[in-house]
């Protein structure tokens, strides 16, 4: 990450040093259609996927416990934006952003007892004997899908010789889907096999407002920064299933009329020409309150063992991106 950031900074410095006359950021008098395509390497954050507890029962006095976390890797995301500008009267634009990534891991445990937490802990299933004794082999899979769709009115305003401000206001729809699965077995008589799955589905709709500041450094190069804020209302649902030794447990949770927020931020370097722009940048989204479900519980493993709490309720997640894109304009200034 540090290398990519240094590269972007170096490009900006070199271009600034080679500057010609500063260009006004495009926008106030442009009339016509435009299309923007964006691709990104996106890292989801805040998922806090605790899939199991590892217990070392060789020392009954201290009984060390360790939460095991699934590490969600970065994946690709993309967005498309289509709009029409009426010049000084402003314009309309529609934007769709999507992130879809699957991860998996397989592990063999030769020392610790493994108690999976995907179902929610023993306060949910009342079965403290559901676990894997060493040696045990298990697989964890994760699927994350997030989408936003925006319909915005915008208006571009001159703020100086080099500055323009693009004011944005409109509507936003957002959705988040997550699947987490634990499946394992051991070779002893303790447990034949365990499979736990959890599905989270959250949808919301609301309003959005923001601004994009453009600063022209040279005739064909400038910087852009964007901040936007959305307030949304929606629902979150959770469905978990456990199959252990032929016994099936199922749990459904639903949260209605939740209020959440999405904050967008972005900083990019832009190379501009009359018909198109090229850019690279760093940005992301922070989702607060969306989704909002209970994915953990207080855990009591067996009589006499210490109790620990799990509270990974997805109350704040994020998507951080290094991205690049192109904008085409089909009208005239």
Model regions and ranges:
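Transmembrane beta-strands of outer-membrane beta-barrel proteins
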Residues: 33-37, 90-94, 165-171, 207-209, ...
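Extracellular/periplasm-exposed beta-strand and loop segments of Gram-negative cell-envelope proteins
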Residues: 47-73, 100-146, 175-204, 233-262, ...
């Amino acid at each position: 990450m540090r290398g990519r950031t240094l590269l972007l900074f170096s490009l900006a410095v070199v271009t600034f040093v080679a500057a010609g006359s500063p260009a006004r950021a495009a926008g106030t008098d442009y009339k016509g259609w435009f299309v923007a395509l964006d691709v990104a390497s996106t890292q989801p954050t805040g998922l806090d996927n605790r899939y199991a507890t590892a217990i070392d029962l060789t020392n009954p006095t201290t009984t060390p416990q360790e939460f095991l976390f699934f590490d969600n890797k970065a994946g690709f995301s993309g967005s498309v934006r289509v709009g029409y500008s009426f010049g000084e009267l402003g314009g309309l634009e529609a934007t769709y952003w999507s992130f879809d990534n699957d991860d998996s891991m397989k592990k063999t445990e030769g020392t610790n007892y493994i108690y999976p937490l995907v179902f929610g802990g023993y306060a949910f299933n009342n079965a403290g004997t559901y676990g894997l004794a060493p040696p045990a082999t298990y697989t964890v899979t994760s699927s994350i899908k997030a989408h936003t769709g925006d319909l915005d009115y915008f208006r571009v305003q001159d703020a100086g010789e080099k500055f323009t401000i693009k004011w944005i206001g409109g509507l936003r729809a957002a959705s988040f889907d997550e699947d987490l699965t634990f499946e394992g077995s051991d070779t002893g008589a303790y447990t034949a096999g365990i499979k736990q799955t959890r599905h989270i589905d959250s949808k919301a709709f609301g309003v959005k407002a923001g601004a994009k500041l453009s600063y022209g450094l040279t005739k064909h190069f400038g910087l852009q920064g964007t901040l936007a804020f959305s307030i949304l209302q929606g629902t979150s649902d959770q469905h978990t299933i456990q199959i252990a030794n032929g016994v099936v447990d199922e749990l459904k949770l639903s949260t209605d009329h939740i209020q959440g927020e999405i904050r967008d931020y972005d900083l990019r370097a832009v190379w501009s020409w009359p018909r198109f722009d090229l850019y690279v940048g760093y940005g992301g989204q922070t989702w607060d309150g969306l989704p909002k479900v209970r994915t953990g519980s207080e855990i009591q493993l067996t009589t006499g063992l210490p109790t620990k709490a799990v509270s990974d309720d997805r109350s704040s997640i994020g998507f951080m991106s290094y991205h690049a894109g192109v904008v085409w304009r089909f009208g005239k200034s």
